[in-house]
Curated annotation (Swiss-Prot):
Catalytic activity: carbamoyl phosphate + L-aspartate = N-carbamoyl-L-aspartate + phosphate + H(+)
Organism the protein comes from: Helicobacter pylori (strain P12)
InterPro entries: Asp/Orn_carbamoyltranf_P-bd, Asp/Orn_carbamoylTrfase, Asp/Orn_carbamoylTrfase_sf, Asp_carbamoyltransf, Asp_carbamoyltransf_Asp/Orn-bd
Protein known as: Aspartate carbamoyltransferase catalytic subunit
GO biological process: 'de novo' pyrimidine nucleobase biosynthetic process; 'de novo' UMP biosynthetic process; amino acid metabolic process
Signal sequence bounds: none
Gene this protein is translated from: pyrB
Function field: Catalyzes the condensation of carbamoyl phosphate and aspartate to form carbamoyl aspartate and inorganic phosphate, the committed step in the de novo pyrimidine nucleotide biosynthesis pathway.
Domain of life: Bacteria
Keywords annotated in UniProt: Pyrimidine biosynthesis, Transferase
Amino acid sequence: MPKKCRHLLQTSDLSLDEIKLLLNKASVYANDFNAVSLETKEKMHNKIIVALFFENSTRTVSSFEIASLRLGAKIVKLNMQTSSTSKGETLIDTFKNIHAMQPDAIITRHAFSSTPFKLAEFSQCPLINAGSGTSAHPTQALLDLLTLYQHFGGLENLKGKKIAFIGDVKNSRVANSNIKLLQRLGLEIMLCAPSSMLPSTPLRTTHNIEEAIEFADILMSLRTQTERHNAPIFASLKDYGNAYCITQQRLKAHAKNKEVVILHPGPVHRDIDIESAVLEDKRSKVLEQVKNGVAMRMAVLEFLLLD
C-alpha cells in the first residue's frame, strides 16, 4: 500500500491558507529568483524531479525546469516520442518504471483528464499535474492568481472583481482551473465564446466580446484549441479573430476608462486572440504571467518536497 503523499492534481487539493502561503512564497521569488534560502538549497540539492509530458509544452515544462534548478534540485525530462510508449508500453507501466527509480517528485501532462488521478494511486512521491485533458492545470491557475494578486495588491482586493474568459472555454483546462479557484476567492465570472466553445454551465455567458469587455475588470483570452475540435467551427482563425480578438479599438469603445488587466496562458495567436498592439500595452500581463510561472512553481515544489 503506497504511503500517504501530498499531490497537486487540482486547485481544490489546496486549502485557502495553503494558497496564501504559496502566494507569499512565490511573491518573494517573483521579486528575486535568487531569494532561495541556503537551508532550502541544501535540502533540495539531492532532490531529483522527473517531467513526464505526453503532450507538447514550451512554457510549462521550461518553467518547471528553471524552477527546479533555481531551487537547487535536478530535473530529468523524458522525450515521450522516443520513449518505450512508442513501442507499445502502457502509460501505467511507463509510470511504474519511472517511479521505481525513486525520483523525489514527478510532473506529468496528459491528454486525458483522469490520468493524474490514476497515476496518483501508484505514486509514493509528490505528483504534480501540469495539465490534464480539458479539466485541470493547477499551477497555471496559481500563477495567474499570483499575477492578479500582485496587480490588485492582495487577495482582499480581488473579491468582487469581474473576470471574463474569452475564447475556447469548453476545451480549456486553464479556464476550468481558474474558474474553480477564482470562484473560491469571490470573483464574478463571465464566459464569452461562440456556443460551440461554451460548456454547459450556470455561469453568466455571452457570445458578444463587447459585452464581456464592458463587464470585466480582467480579461483572460484563450487559445482556440483546434486540436481538440471534431470539426472546424470557423472557416478560418481570421474569421474567429474578427469576432473575438481583443483589440485596442474594442477596449477604447467598451472598457469605459477602466484599466482592465489582460491575461493569456499562451501560446498566443497574435491578432487572433489578442491584437499585437494590445500585447505590447501596459495592460497586458502576459509576460508577467510567464515570469510568475517560475516563481509559483518554485513555491509549489518547495511546498510539496520540503514542507
